[in-house]
Amino acid sequence: MADDKGTDPKEGCSDFIYLEAECSDISDLDNDLETLLEEGAGSDISDLINDEVVEQGNSRELLCQQEREESELQVQYLKRKCFSPKAVQELSPRLQSMNISSEHKSKRRLFVEQDSGLELSLNEAEDSTQELEVPASAPAPAAEGDIGLGTVRDLLRSSNSRATLLSKFKDSFGVSFTELTRQYKSNKTCCHHWVLAVYAAKDDLIDASKQLLQQHCFYIWLQSFCPMSLYLCCFNVGKSRDTVVRLIATLLQVHENHILSEPPKNRSIPAALFWYKGSLNSNVFCFGEAPDWILSQTMIQHQTADTLQFDLSRMIQWAYDNDHIDESIIAYQYAKLADIDSNAKAFLAHNSQVKYVKECALMVRYYKRGEMKEMSISAWIHHCISKVEGEGNWQHIVRFIRYQNLNFIMFLDKFRTFLKNLPKKNCLLIYGPPDTGKSMFAMSLIKLLKGSVVSFANSKSQFWLQPLADGKIGLLDDATDVCWQYIDSFLRNGLDGNLVSLDIKHKAPCQMKFPPLIITSNINLLKEERYRFLHSRVTQIDFPNKFPFDSDNKPLFELTDQSWASFFKRLWTQLELSDQEDEGDNGNSQRTFHCTAREVNGHI
């Protein structure tokens, strides 16, 4: 049997009970408690409990301040679209209130659909002024006040420097800078004339600039009202804004941000009067002669007596005299005359320039065509060679013909009948191997006589023969076998010298005869039996030899306008061309054609 657990029962009670049961007398316990309390009065944990009267501090004020800041932040988030913080305006409200031009708000829509609210939000955003929203930030501590103020000054200097200079310029000169200038958005755009407003330049440097700028400008206008100085510089060559600003900043020792630079308004009469009247003041320095855009708007001239109106007939007369029939050339060349011609200036100011250019080109073509139709072939050749400048050598053409193994007398006979446009003799075929000078010979003649060129590549169009109606001579270059089949099928009547019906665009088919027609080809028709019906209608000339060139790859025979003009003058009688005296041309004393009603006392 196992030992029993617990205390030993043999001795009755264990020692633990006796040990714990011993206690001191009650009187002794009371004395010990009093002693303990007396000794503990001077211990380190004395005054642990504060029994003094509690006073209310500033905790309520701090709580109210925190709640107020939190409420303001929440209200600001809710009303961010209506009340955006404007840091720059709060820094300088007086400067922000200065406006050079009036501001206009965007127009509201009259009828807005009340649907999902998306459109209302868009309209609300459009009605508000488009400004950069600055997020709210906590105020800087007192120790960081200088650093924050320096940042604000840099921001104000970089963002509002132009507005500040414009305000100071208007206070000094009494006129807005933008009223005198037009705006160039790009700093790389070049202009001869520049208006410069310089801020805070030294007087001695301003006086020195009067002499230093004379080597760059042909006209200088300078007036100074402290602290602003106004320059009008007309440079000898066109300069960009970057170049001009660097030049002025170097001469006057100022920062580039202190310079306003724009080109002047050269079409504004008030601006021109400002510069002109200013040049009469004693405190204004002027060097050189005033530019034309100032004089033309301020000086009284006889041209200003009449109202500046555009006259289309004068433009047509100019295009006719200069042989301009292309619309792009007419528009460009006439616009270049705006500085010296009042009618060209009125043309640029008109809103219907495209209409006038088209009408001018069309009328010139009508006049030229009527003039050509009135002339005979002899008169037309004389008219063309009279406009050739320079001297040529007719022997180059003669040597080239002999180089091709042709009898020159036989060539003259064929060429004479060709120019007379005789029936079945009005088509001249130049055939031979490639690179023999066929096209060069024919093109040089067509260029002198201002003939028309047709191309078989456009044969699918029914108007491909229309240019033949506008020329005294025609050319069909490089006729292939397909082209000869077309000629054999449809153009026999034209080669016979009879009237044909020619379809012209935007017009009814007209009745006309083909002009003398030159055809170049590599095919010899006499050896083609299938084209036997063309043998009697075509006069053939063979060019068997290749065109020669020298060591510098230049042609040995000069087939130019001067050479052909000399050729016709030399062989005028042999070609049986009519005498110009018989046709009424007795020299250049006759009055040229004019299409405008010139006044007796008008300009010559």
Swiss-Prot record:
Phosphorylated. Keywords: ATP-binding, DNA replication, DNA-binding, Early protein, Helicase, Host nucleus, Hydrolase, Isomerase, Isopeptide bond, Nucleotide-binding, Phosphoprotein, Ubl conjugation. ATP binds at G432, P433, P434, D435, T436, G437, K438, S439. Residues 144-307 are annotated as: DNA-binding region. GO terms for molecular function: ATP binding; ATP hydrolysis activity; DNA binding; DNA helicase activity. The modification Phosphoserine is found at S84, S92. GO terms for biological process: DNA replication. Can form hexamers. Interacts with E2 protein; this interaction increases E1 DNA binding specificity. Interacts with host DNA polymerase subunit POLA2. Interacts with host single stranded DNA-binding protein RPA1. Interacts with host TOP1; this interaction stimulates the enzymatic activity of TOP1. ATP-dependent DNA 3'-5' helicase required for initiation of viral DNA replication. It forms a complex with the viral E2 protein. The E1-E2 complex binds to the replication origin which contains binding sites for both proteins. During the initial step, a dimer of E1 interacts with a dimer of protein E2 leading to a complex that binds the viral origin of replication with high specificity. Then, a second dimer of E1 displaces the E2 dimer in an ATP-dependent manner to form the E1 tetramer. This is Replication protein E1. It comes from Human papillomavirus 38. The lineage of its organism: Viruses, Monodnaviria, Shotokuvirae, Cossaviricota, Papovaviricetes.
